[in-house]
């Protein structure tokens, strides 16, 4: 019976060894699978980070495009406004020339001249409301940024380097010189 018992014990041991071996193989397989899962999780996190970075870059790019577009639109607006304002200056000159001529030929009190005066006044008021400034007032210090020197003359009434008279008004808009005022300046 010992022999039978030994064989049974051997079978049990063999069976237990097989079970242990299967357990170990199963544990190894689970460990490998867990490692694969961890690697996949890590890759997923990395990919999510890449996607987030790409999304942030896209948003930043969209904001930059929006900002650049707004700046370009503003620049175009300013350029077109400046161009428009420069085109009005000759009209102002013409109206002023008519008014100056009307005093010379003594038709200053004619209704049409009054209409021209009102038109010029309205136009200058509108430009003033838009931010256009008239440059070239008498007795102001000569400024080469806004004045164009026509000539210098001796003057007892005006301080040296100050405007004696204005041949043509100058105009500025938002610190942009649309036209320099043509002026005569007092000498020292």
UniProtKB/Swiss-Prot annotation:
<dbReference type="GO" id="GO:0005829">
    <property type="term" value="C:cytosol"/>
</dbReference>
<comment type="similarity">
    <text>Belongs to the GrpE family.</text>
</comment>
<dbReference type="GO" id="GO:0051082">
    <property type="term" value="F:unfolded protein binding"/>
</dbReference>
<comment type="function">
    <text>Participates actively in the response to hyperosmotic and heat shock by preventing the aggregation of stress-denatured proteins, in association with DnaK and GrpE. It is the nucleotide exchange factor for DnaK and may function as a thermosensor. Unfolded proteins bind initially to DnaJ; upon interaction with the DnaJ-bound protein, DnaK hydrolyzes its bound ATP, resulting in the formation of a stable complex. GrpE releases ADP from DnaK; ATP binding to DnaK triggers the release of the substrate protein, thus completing the reaction cycle.</text>
</comment>
<protein>
    <recommendedName>
        <fullName>Protein GrpE 2</fullName>
    </recommendedName>
</protein>
<dbReference type="Pfam" id="PF01025">
    <property type="entry name" value="GrpE"/>
</dbReference>
<keyword id="KW-0963">Cytoplasm</keyword>
<dbReference type="GO" id="GO:0006457">
    <property type="term" value="P:protein folding"/>
</dbReference>
<dbReference type="InterPro" id="IPR000740">
    <property type="entry name" value="GrpE"/>
</dbReference>
<comment type="subunit">
    <text>Homodimer.</text>
</comment>
<dbReference type="GO" id="GO:0042803">
    <property type="term" value="F:protein homodimerization activity"/>
</dbReference>
<dbReference type="GO" id="GO:0000774">
    <property type="term" value="F:adenyl-nucleotide exchange factor activity"/>
</dbReference>
<dbReference type="InterPro" id="IPR013805">
    <property type="entry name" value="GrpE_coiled_coil"/>
</dbReference>
<dbReference type="InterPro" id="IPR009012">
    <property type="entry name" value="GrpE_head"/>
</dbReference>
<dbReference type="GO" id="GO:0051087">
    <property type="term" value="F:protein-folding chaperone binding"/>
</dbReference>
<keyword id="KW-0346">Stress response</keyword>
<keyword id="KW-0143">Chaperone</keyword>
């Amino acid at each position: 019976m010992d022999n039978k018992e030994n064989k049974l014990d051997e079978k049990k041991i063999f069976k237990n060894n097989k079970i242990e071996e299967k357990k170990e193989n199963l544990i190894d397989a689970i460990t490998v699978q867990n490692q694969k899962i961890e690697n996949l999780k890590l890759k997923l996190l990395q990919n999510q980070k890449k996607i987030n970075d790409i999304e942030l870059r896209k948003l930043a790019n969209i904001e930059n495009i929006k900002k650049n577009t707004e700046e370009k639109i503003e620049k175009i607006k300013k350029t077109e406004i400046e161009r428009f304002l420069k085109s009005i200056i000759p009209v102002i000159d013409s109206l002023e020339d008519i008014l100056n001529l009307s005093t010379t030929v003594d038709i200053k009190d004619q209704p049409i001249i009054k209409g021209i005066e009102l038109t010029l006044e309205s136009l200058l008021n509108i430009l003033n409301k838009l931010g256009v400034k008239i440059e070239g007032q008498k007795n102001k210090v000569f400024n080469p940024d806004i004045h164009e020197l026509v000539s210098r003359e001796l003057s007892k009434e005006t301080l040296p380097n100050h405007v004696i008279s204005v041949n043509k008004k100058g105009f500025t808009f938002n610190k942009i010189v649309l036209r320099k005022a043509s002026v005569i300046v007092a000498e020292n």
